[in-house]
């Protein structure tokens, strides 16, 4: 139940975005599904990394509902799916770089070393396959979900510190 409560928001928000675009623009775009899938996966990665970074503090307060090993497995699985989707979607380096920079601020110590090599193949593939032609759906939906996740994380940390 805690997994659904904690990680259900990105999926619901992406479905809401897809529904809104579908009704506003007719059938939407084939790129919309790719953009939303990337958005959801990046959103999960950000949330999982935040949970891993705060695990010790949560455990000390008795609020760690999930074991750390499960969180690490979830993170590796999400990054693997993201890498595969990057191969399929020919995601752009401009999309991946801000995510890596953002994750650097959220992740602590040794877990930062786990993240970097997992993102490197996606970055290399994006450089090779990308023609650097901007895609509207990728550059609109992904930042919306990433910004919403960062806002939620900031509020969560402020609430915990009070």
Model-derived features with residue positions:
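Solvent-exposed interhelical
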Residues: 40-78, 150-162
């Amino acid at each position: 139940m805690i997994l659904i409560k904690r990680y259900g928001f990105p999926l619901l928000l992406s479905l809401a975005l897809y529904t809104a675009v579908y009704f506003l623009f007719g059938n939407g775009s084939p790129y919309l599904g790719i953009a939303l899938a990337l958005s959801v996966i990046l959103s999960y990665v950000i949330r999982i990394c935040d949970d891993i970074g705060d695990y010790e503090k949560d455990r000390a307060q008795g609020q760690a509902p999930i074991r750390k090993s499960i969180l690490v497995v979830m993170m590796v699985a999400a990054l693997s799916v993201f890498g595969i989707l990057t191969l399929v979607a020919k995601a752009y380096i401009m999309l991946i770089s801000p995510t890596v920079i953002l994750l650097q601020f959220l992740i602590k110590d040794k877990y930062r070393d786990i993240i970097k090599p997992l993102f490197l193949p996606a970055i290399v593939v994006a450089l090779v396959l990308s023609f650097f032609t901007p895609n509207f759906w990728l550059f609109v939906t992904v930042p919306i979900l990433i910004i919403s996740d960062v806002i939620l994380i900031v509020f969560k940390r402020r609430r915990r510190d009070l």
